[in-house]
From Swiss-Prot:
Identification of the protein by name: MLP-like protein 329
Gene3D superfamilies: 3.30.530.20
UniProt xrefs under InterPro entries: Bet_v_I/MLP (IPR000916), MLP-like (IPR052006), START-like_dom_sf (IPR023393)
CDD domains: Bet_v1-like
Taxonomic source organism: Arabidopsis thaliana
Family under the similarity heading: Belongs to the MLP family.
Length: 151
């Protein structure tokens, strides 16, 4: 049986949790202009930008290498949670399960957090653990912070 695991981290943010949630929920098309050093393109494959179960294709750079990721988005507005379920792409060559969960919380007027949870399962025991992807995701969320504040 292949190894599986869960990584969890929190990224402190500025502004409002609602504004950050809206950017991640509805405005993925703005990511390449805002953080092009991480995300070079996002296209809708099926559905709409803001629709539950929309399928999108992301072009990004992780560890200096261009990669592609196809995901299905799940939305939980009540809890300000967005889940991207991995379907295809570079990361899916090594992982059988790759779910990314972003939860935005306004703890106080000056204390906003994005909790990132990555649930993963390797295809084989020989595949590396995806810790580099968690580092990448944390950097994407942190770098998007300034752009959300300016919006």
């Amino acid at each position: 049986m292949a190894t599986s695991g869960t990584y969890v981290t929190e990224v402190p943010l500025k502004g409002s949790a609602d504004k950050h949630y809206k950017r991640w929920r509805d405005e993925n098309h703005l990511f390449p202009d805002a953080i092009g050093h991480h995300i070079q393109g996002v296209t809708v494959h099926d559905g709409e930008w803001d629709s539950h179960e929309a399928i999108k294709i992301w072009n990004y750079t992780c560890d200096g290498k261009p990669e592609v990721f196809k995901e299905r988005k799940e939305i939980d507005d009540e809890n300000m949670v967005i889940t991207f379920r991995g379907l295809e792409g570079h990361v899916m060559e090594q992982l059988k399960v790759y779910d990314l969960i972003y939860q935005f919380s306004q703890k106080s007027p000056d204390d906003i957090v994005c909790k990132i949870t990555m649930i993963w399962e390797k295809r084989t025991d020989d595949s590396p653990e995806p810790s580099n992807y968690m580092k990448f995701l944390k950097s994407v969320v942190a770098d998007m912070d300034e752009h959300v504040l300016k919006a």
